[in-house]
Amino acid sequence: MLLAIVLAARFRKPVPIVFGILFATLANHAVASFAGAEAAAWFDGYWFRLAVALGFIAMGLWTLVPDKFDEDDKPQESFGPFLTTLIAFFLVEIGDKTQVATIALGARYHDVLAVTTGTTLGMLAANVPAVFLGDKLVQKISLKHIRWTAAALFVGLGIWMLVTL
């Protein structure tokens, strides 16, 4: 979300930024979802389901750690808002919490299209308001509250998976 705010403030062109986020997320999450589904096909069984459940709980706890965006990580501006956003979001998502969660969801549900669609919609739901509202949004909604809610959802899903093993 912080990257979306920075890009919106820098370029002041929300539509290409939103499309950059959309296409970067689709590409990144399709690969992650596919990787999760394939891993589940290779390692299906009780221990794998247990690992996925514990992974969701770990994701919930990891969600409580705020994202960082260093000034040194500023994206290159020479490409324009769409390409800069596309590249920056794709690279920032590699190994990030949402990518790890997408891998876990792909492993759990074995449906690359549904998982990619759902996680991409989630990313857009989090980032599009940030692009259009930026600083005003952060002043109105506590990021701490959002993190705690997301953490509770991840932990709840992990516990539900443990109970249904």
Model-derived features with residue positions:
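Membrane helix-loop-helix hairpins that form the core translocation module of multi-pass transporters
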Residues: 13-72, 77, 129-140, 149-152
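Functional transmembrane helices that embed catalytic/metal-coordinating motifs
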Residues: 1-4, 84-102
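Structural signature of hydrophobic alpha-helical transmembrane segments
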Residues: 47-55, 111-126
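Hydrophobic/aromatic residues within the transmembrane alpha-helices of Major Facilitator Superfamily
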Residues: 26-27, 61, 90, 94, ...
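Juxtamembrane boundary at the C-terminal end of a transmembrane helix
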Residues: 158-165
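Small-residue-enriched transmembrane helix starts and helix-helix packing motifs
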Residues: 64, 68-92, 113-117, 121
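Juxtamembrane transmembrane-helix termini in multi-pass membrane transport proteins
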Residues: 1-41, 100-122
